[in-house]
Amino acid sequence: MSNKKLHFETLQLHVGQEQADPATDSRAVPIYQTTSYVFRNSQHAADRFGLRDAGNIYGRLTNSTQGVFEDRVAALEGGVAGLAVASGAAAITYALQNVARNGDHIIAADNLYGGTYNLVEHTLSTQGVETTIVNPSDFDAVDKAFKPNTKAIIIETFGNPNASVTDVDRISEIAHKHNTIVIVDNTFGTPFLFRPIEHGADVVVHSATKFIGGHGSSLGGVIVDAGKFDWKANADKYPSIAKPDPSYHGAVFAEVAGPAAFVTRIRAVILRDTGAAISPFNAWILLQGLETLSLRVERHAFNTKKVVEFLANHPKVAKVNHPSLPDHPDHALYEKLFPNGGGSIFTFEVKGGEKEAWAFIDSLKIFSLLANVADVKSLVIHPATTTHSQLSPEELEQQHIYPSTIRLSIGTEHYEDIIDDLANALENI
């Protein structure tokens, strides 16, 4: 390939395998279904384990199929390196555990996915990590939430489930004033529509199960390192990355791995010790999805626009929570950050309550009632009694989830068929 900067649609097909597979001459990325790798000699083995020679060591840490997937997602996000793990939840957990330990503090947006909210509010607290929950649109509150021991702020490009939009530029500006990293979950944004690193993010995480895979078939997560944070200048704040690691013979990851220090430390230490490794087969399946990401996301966005317009004008719909609507509080920010649309996972409220919401859901024919999102098939769920059922009534209200709230994930079927299904179900309430 030439040195000319390639377009997204080309990168999603070629990065990581610019030439045919060196072992087999295969054009498609092979599935390297192995646990282990043969070293040429003892010195070669020692160099691999000592991080002096990059390459495969053991299947829990690296795999050649996985490596192509990691390189491709990192390139699409504009990062320097990526790490694929077993799920999106593992990616988020590892990103936070990489910098926050017992006695530390993190900040989390109040519009995070319910599973992430439980992680930061409950699970990490048992590990001695304190979390402050903030409204990411209240910049004064965000600024005041920082403490000397704050190690990260985690936000989402689109909130789950209400598709609220986060001003990544402003949050990054505030966090960097406090010499703190910004972790952005870009699962719903996708790198095709929005690249958080270009807006100040230091780390990007994905549930690759969603848009990247796109077909609801395989679990996976990805962590992308922007490679821009100065770890050595903040060594006292981030000793796990910028000071000697006693579990790795005193290696300083900021020196050994340079710009890729963040993900290298996760791979070499946290993944090594806790083992949420992605399987080669899942990495391969997710690669198949990644190759058509732009095509699918364009259709998702187009269909979503049509569906939102339909619901916003239906007499049995009380409210549609989508930033494309002029009366949405994030509308101006949405127009600025997402000129090509997006937000195909969103909520709306039927007139009535849980009874009416359930009646609507149970009357749908094309939509599938399940917990996943961002599938090519249209999906539906009742958040208050399923995905967010662990939250207290006060927490549900804080996230604007009510008995009448329904979450939709708009697929790539023909938009008229999607709308007909919604219209018929609304007639049954």
Language-model-detected regions and their locations in the chain:
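PLP-dependent enzyme catalytic core of the Aspartate aminotransferase-like
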Residues: E9, V80, E121, P148, ...
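Conserved N-terminal alpha-helix of the aminotransferase class I/II PLP-enzyme fold
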Residues: N41-T93, G115-H122
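Conserved small-domain helix->loop->beta segment predominantly found in fold-type I
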Residues: T274-A283, Q288, T292, V297-R299, ...
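Active-site beta-loop-alpha junctions enriched in small/polar residues
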Residues: F158, T187-G189, L325, K351, ...
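Short hydrophobic/aromatic beta-strand micro-patches
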Residues: V224, T347-E349, S409-G411
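N-terminal "arm"/small-domain region of PLP-dependent enzymes with the aminotransferase-like
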Residues: S2-N63, D71-R72
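Conserved PLP-enzyme active-site core in the AAT-like
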Residues: S2-N3, G16-A20, L83-H314
